[in-house]
């Protein structure tokens, strides 16, 4: 079973939190707010996205790399994670 399926409820809860934070940000942008408050909300969204990314990467590393018996498959899965990290960190 894929770790994203196994951890579906936890990951969906994180995604819902992010969605709520984005909705709140959009409302903030419709009304006058201090820049600091808007920046704080953006930082909260970024933190939540980072947390979701961390959980998915952690599951991927554990399931597809640490517990993977096939060396070739392990290397392929590691390449996938490294490419995602490269694009995310840009």
Curated annotation (Swiss-Prot):
InterPro entries named among the record's database cross-references: Metal_Tscrpt_repr, Metal_Tscrpt_repr_sf
GO BP field: negative regulation of DNA-templated transcription
UniProt main location, coarse: cytoplasm
Compartments reported by the entry: Cytoplasm
GO CC terms: cytoplasm; protein-DNA complex
Keywords: Cytoplasm, DNA-binding, Repressor, Transcription, Transcription regulation
Disulphide connectivity of cysteines: none
Pfam families linked to this entry: Trns_repr_metal
GO molecular function: DNA-binding transcription repressor activity; metal ion binding; transcription cis-regulatory region binding
Family: Belongs to the FrmR/RcnR family.
Chain's role: Repressor of rcnA expression. Acts by binding specifically to the rcnA promoter in the absence of nickel and cobalt. In the presence of one of these metals, it has a weaker affinity for rcnA promoter.
PANTHER family for the chain: TRANSCRIPTIONAL REPRESSOR FRMR-RELATED, TRANSCRIPTIONAL REPRESSOR RCNR
Protein's UniProt name: Transcriptional repressor RcnR
Organism: Escherichia coli (strain K12)
């Amino acid at each position: 079973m894929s770790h994203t399926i196994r951890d579906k409820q936890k990951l969906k809860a994180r995604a819902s939190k992010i969605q709520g934070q984005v909705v709140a940000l959009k409302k903030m942008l419709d009304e006058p707010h201090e820049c600091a408050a808007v920046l704080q909300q953006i930082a909260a969204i970024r933190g939540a996205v980072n947390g979701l990314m961390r959980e998915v990467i952690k599951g991927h590393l554990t399931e597809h790399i640490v517990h993977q018996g096939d060396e070739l498959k392990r290397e392929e899965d590691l390449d996938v994670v490294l490419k995602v990290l490269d694009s995310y960190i840009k």
